[in-house]
Amino acid sequence: MRPSNRTPAQTRPITITRSFTAHAEGSVLVEFGDTKVLCTASFTEGVPRFLKGQGQGWVTAEYGMLPRSTHSRMDREAARGKQSGRTQEIQRLIGRALRAAVDMKLLGENTIVIDCDVIQADGGTRTAAITGACVALVDALNWARGKGIIKANPLKFLIAAVSVGIYKGEAISDLEYIEDSAAETDMNVVMTETGKIIEIQGTAEGEPFSHEELLELLVLAKNSIREIVDVQKAALS
Amino acid sequence: MRPSNRTPAQTRPITITRSFTAHAEGSVLVEFGDTKVLCTASFTEGVPRFLKGQGQGWVTAEYGMLPRSTHSRMDREAARGKQSGRTQEIQRLIGRALRAAVDMKLLGENTIVIDCDVIQADGGTRTAAITGACVALVDALNWARGKGIIKANPLKFLIAAVSVGIYKGEAISDLEYIEDSAAETDMNVVMTETGKIIEIQGTAEGEPFSHEELLELLVLAKNSIREIVDVQKAALS
Amino acid sequence: MRPSNRTPAQTRPITITRSFTAHAEGSVLVEFGDTKVLCTASFTEGVPRFLKGQGQGWVTAEYGMLPRSTHSRMDREAARGKQSGRTQEIQRLIGRALRAAVDMKLLGENTIVIDCDVIQADGGTRTAAITGACVALVDALNWARGKGIIKANPLKFLIAAVSVGIYKGEAISDLEYIEDSAAETDMNVVMTETGKIIEIQGTAEGEPFSHEELLELLVLAKNSIREIVDVQKAALS
Amino acid sequence: MRPSNRTPAQTRPITITRSFTAHAEGSVLVEFGDTKVLCTASFTEGVPRFLKGQGQGWVTAEYGMLPRSTHSRMDREAARGKQSGRTQEIQRLIGRALRAAVDMKLLGENTIVIDCDVIQADGGTRTAAITGACVALVDALNWARGKGIIKANPLKFLIAAVSVGIYKGEAISDLEYIEDSAAETDMNVVMTETGKIIEIQGTAEGEPFSHEELLELLVLAKNSIREIVDVQKAALS
Amino acid sequence: MRPSNRTPAQTRPITITRSFTAHAEGSVLVEFGDTKVLCTASFTEGVPRFLKGQGQGWVTAEYGMLPRSTHSRMDREAARGKQSGRTQEIQRLIGRALRAAVDMKLLGENTIVIDCDVIQADGGTRTAAITGACVALVDALNWARGKGIIKANPLKFLIAAVSVGIYKGEAISDLEYIEDSAAETDMNVVMTETGKIIEIQGTAEGEPFSHEELLELLVLAKNSIREIVDVQKAALS
Amino acid sequence: MRPSNRTPAQTRPITITRSFTAHAEGSVLVEFGDTKVLCTASFTEGVPRFLKGQGQGWVTAEYGMLPRSTHSRMDREAARGKQSGRTQEIQRLIGRALRAAVDMKLLGENTIVIDCDVIQADGGTRTAAITGACVALVDALNWARGKGIIKANPLKFLIAAVSVGIYKGEAISDLEYIEDSAAETDMNVVMTETGKIIEIQGTAEGEPFSHEELLELLVLAKNSIREIVDVQKAALS
């Protein structure tokens, strides 16, 4: 029934490659099937002006798509001179989610910028990005601990994300592009490694959905995220 | 317990004033307590280029805050030369929600732009905006039917929105600013007049939240939205 | 003869509502007939860099129109990414006029920003804005004196403004939109409460005008401004 | 008494050099003493979209200062990415003034763009620009008549401009920079060759001014403009 | 003597991976040692407006660096709102070089956009980009021929590029970052597969260089490019 | 054979006028035939932030074309809100070339900005700009030495530039516009007064060129630059 013959609850093959590029303190290529996102974590000492002198750190994220990561070429945002509303919405989501996973006091007056650049898109880029970014964040934190810049581990828990939705009347997990573009309802869920909710964003693309459907989607998301966290842990071990 | 002595489930006084300004096809001042948003609906014939010739209409929204609608003055976005990520995120939410309420085929090749401008902010501006924008939309649709530009009523149902959250460990509805800035969890919910979900966006500002808390918030939102729809209906009658 | 049946020298009903919104140190809704402008004055300690250490203050203004304050919807300047030349011309005029009314030494190293946002436009928005902004300025100065931030009153005199013009061959005062768009000559005058000139900007939209016509317009402006100042004084008392 | 030993009514030496550059249909270097502005008129067939099919033409102007036309270097507007409010205010003034001199019906569906670029600044750049632009406009109109693109002469009258002001308590004409920066009142006047008013913009930089002072300044302006028109006519003959 | 122990004439290991991503008509990852650039060629029917109806095609290029492709993080150009001068200079160079390799008449009214995005930077990104872009271009042309969109092969010859320079007094080929940043002279050379020159850009970073040094660098470049073309041909066969 | 009847090696008449405008520390009008560029050098104490405290100076350049310096009017870059890629490429070239001529240690913590504004264009504007800018630079350096701001002369050597190219199969020097637009190969060369190379940028506009053609062009450039340096020296003496 699904174009890929997956069962409703089945995610795509998920792989996480650490140290994908050389310079960043954390550099992860995350793949959810044909969706491939490069997540780099850049650690710098110091914080933005609005946080100076408060003894706490900052984590933020930026998101971009390579112009031909998509089926037809998109305009390059740098050439157009501004980031789209979609881009801003996504990078705000990624940043919020990562900040929830970090104890800012333990991070001290240091900043981590996570860049999530989509190399190839096939649906679910924002949830793949959060999943990969969390691993890059861990690597950057470990780098800083190895350097003695921070003492205790600021990571409160791993976070991971998945998209779920209602497609042809059925709740499915980890939608690929052709499912996503035909879905009646689309929901992105970010959870901790213990299944608590960090962020939930559900949208009725077609018909409004009921509380029952919402609950069904949540269960699906929780199960998928448990599997995804296992992939994160395997990559980190 | 709440700064305003409201019960957890109690919304602020909500008023909807139609025909607040003279030129727009729909013009509504919506007030959720001290949050005041002017929502105007502008009806024009024709659609954006990407929809031409498809026999369907378009609904979109823009959002702004007057520089001193807030406690301390914010920079004017027109002077800075760009809209913030927050602004774009909100106006995309408003637009999506309103489009869910309209049958685009019945709208025909016509466009409605909803401008939501915050005159005074005290938390919940985006949910107030959606609530007021829906009434302005109805007025603009009725205007167009009165002019004979559209035949059947494209409105599928009324929509309304409320913010709910966990504040000092308790689930409360319709957060005002001091509650919102201290909330552990913040959730914006958009529903139809019959209580189906259009959009749900929940964020753990502090600690991650559980499924039980999510359910509790949803019930609170559903009840509040039922009341808010009654205010919409009273204003429209 | 005038669309509103006013006599040539007659202004529209002018009302000034103080404390229109809650947060600003001065907040005034000024109405010249159907033209409605919200003027807020924001008082902050400190001055822009170019004035630091000179023992004097700064007053500046920004102007905007809500997209549907006009007959047909205008593009939102924040979305277009820049303020129009008209907007900049008007806000420079408002700022210059207000600075003329303030003793910058007595203001001390403090800044007042006046935001003039047009809620509904029917001609004469810039002169209404100056008139309302002056009252908001007074409120902000009084607020600062009440707080003990400034000692002596920096206000040198009240200022007010009106548009005058030649319409169907006759000099008239306080043009509304349909008069304004058909006027042969359009002149905006800003004066002190004692009738001295702060700014005069006259433009031949159609035929060039003579010195005699200029003088006639000035007399008209002086008389109208005297009345408008009375409204300001009544609002402030 | 004046830094240049001029009498109050005396303008600086004014020269107008036509055909200063090779490519433009009209190209004029205008000098008011040490203020030097290059004014080029570019004639193109066709009109902007908002005028299409109405059988009339369009005249507009743009203004710029070379970065080191001034005493200390100004930022290049092209590098900063926007034109200042002052620039926009000035180019709007120049455009309005020139449009007043042209019969748009006789111009037909053709456009003239006047570029006024300040090579060297010593006060009065906008009035010098208007004066030179008018001559460049005449050359471009004659070029188009020579080509047979337009039949009748669309020029209604020559226009010229001068700045006048109150300096050390006395009304003076054609202020140079050090006078301008110390003037209590500054007024720019644009008139037709027969002394009718096209535009008047007077600002109290220091103290408000009286009607008597305004009249005195107007007389001064009228006399100076009469002389300046003579220079235009000599250059054109 | 070289940090990598290469001989002066020795290039880094060069690899070209085709079909690196799925959507583009040509997609190549090119590696010059640790410099890695993703080059995608997007083929679309139609040409930009300035070429319409002339029976010829268009080839253009855009260039970007991922923010953390470099040792320390660079600002994201999309977030800053503009491309740097360096970026524009490089993408203009890539576009010119590729256009020299294509017969625009045989391409017909079709457009190819080449996006060169630097995944990891270690010197020579622009020459690596040209080398990889040429292979992506060939793939896109073959794709279009396979589809029957174009008949004859528009490729005139392969092109490839290398950077050469004078480092510690000696002419060397294919500079890596630490050589590049210390080089006295830096020269980028683009040649055809038969060794004719498409573009040469040489800059004295330290001391001016002599004609003899220029010749020596050219010989070095020619030899390296011959080797690089062999890598291109092997990748394409 | 050349449109101007020049011999292949013959440059256009070249004139250099110093002190062309009044305010700049160096102000030069350079003319290569009908190409006229105003080059001003602005000397200011202090350096940009990235150089602070390093005991060395900075030289940079900006380039612009007046909108009607060209055959048909170009958009004003300040109005469009950004500099074109071509503009940025050229001003980067000018800046690099001038920095090669200055000993930054001897300049001390001072900055020189060179503005090159094209008054009239007929090919070769960037090489004319470099030639004129060098003379303006010398004047600014001498001004600073006269003021005692710098002690020793930071100028290492004069630099000058010329464009050469292959036109109708023959190597020619100092191309004017109609030659430039038809040239098969176009090369800009910047040299020191002793004939060493500062920058060489050669582009095959049509067919790729051979090493022999490159050498021929270089000889031509060297001879022309020797003559141009003589004009510089004559102007400076």
UniProtKB/Swiss-Prot annotation, chains A, B, C, D, E, F:
Superkingdom of source: Bacteria
Catalytic reaction list: tRNA(n+1) + phosphate = tRNA(n) + a ribonucleoside 5'-diphosphate
InterPro entries, alphabetized: ExoRNase_PH_dom1, ExoRNase_PH_dom2, ExoRNase_PH_dom2_sf, PNPase/RNase_PH_dom_sf, Ribosomal_Su5_D2-typ_SF, RNase_PH, RNase_PH_bac-type, RNase_PH_CS
Keywords (A to Z) from UniProt: Nucleotidyltransferase, RNA-binding, rRNA processing, Transferase, tRNA processing, tRNA-binding
Listed EC numbers: 2.7.7.56
Family of this protein: Belongs to the RNase PH family.
Protein name: Ribonuclease PH
